[in-house]
């Protein structure tokens, strides 16, 4: 089956490049569209204590850093990137909204294979929320012996 529009969900870690390369290799033979999305999962909702931080300035800085990182990934993809999206909130809902709006037929995301990722896997949540094909790519941190 040839996909028409692949959405790459990235966390902006160095491994995001691996996901982009994988999606581009799948898209090229069929001239499929490729888009990037980063979802800033809002963990502040889970924290009920007081924080003495200027959240407005911090959110602006984070937004700028996210935009810059997505732009860099897009420019280094070696393939045209249709959309570069950034959202915040519930990962599953943000992806579902993007899937509908941009007619996505494949979501590609990574899964870090460490203890915390196994315990709090985003992939598990997505499997129950996203109703298009998904490709979950196992990612290993450099400390685990993966060579460049």
Curated annotation (Swiss-Prot):
Keywords: Cytoplasm. It is found in: Cytoplasm. Signal peptide: none annotated. GO terms for cellular component: cytoplasm. Gene3D superfamilies: HUPs. It holds the Pfam family Usp. Required for resistance to DNA-damaging agents. Homodimer. This is Universal stress protein A. It comes from Yersinia pestis. The lineage of its organism: Bacteria, Pseudomonadati, Pseudomonadota, Gammaproteobacteria, Enterobacterales. The gene is uspA.
């Amino acid at each position: 089956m040839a996909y028409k529009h692949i959405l790459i969900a990235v966390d902006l870690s160095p491994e995001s490049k691996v996901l982009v390369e994988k999606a581009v290799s799948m898209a090229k033979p069929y001239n499929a569209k490729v888009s990037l999305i980063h979802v800033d999962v809002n963990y502040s909702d889970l924290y009920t204590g007081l924080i003495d931080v200027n959240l407005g300035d911090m959110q602006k800085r984070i937004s700028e850093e996210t935009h810059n990182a997505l732009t860099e990934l897009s420019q280094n993809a070696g393939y045209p990137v249709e959309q570069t999206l950034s959202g915040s909130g519930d990962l599953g809902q943000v992806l579902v909204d993007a899937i509908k709006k941009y007619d996505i037929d494949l979501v590609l995301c990574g899964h870090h294979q460490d203890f915390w990722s196994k315990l709090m896997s985003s992939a598990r949540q997505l499997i129950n929320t996203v109703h298009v094909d998904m490709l979950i790519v196992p990612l290993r941190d450099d400390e685990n012996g993966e060579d460049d």
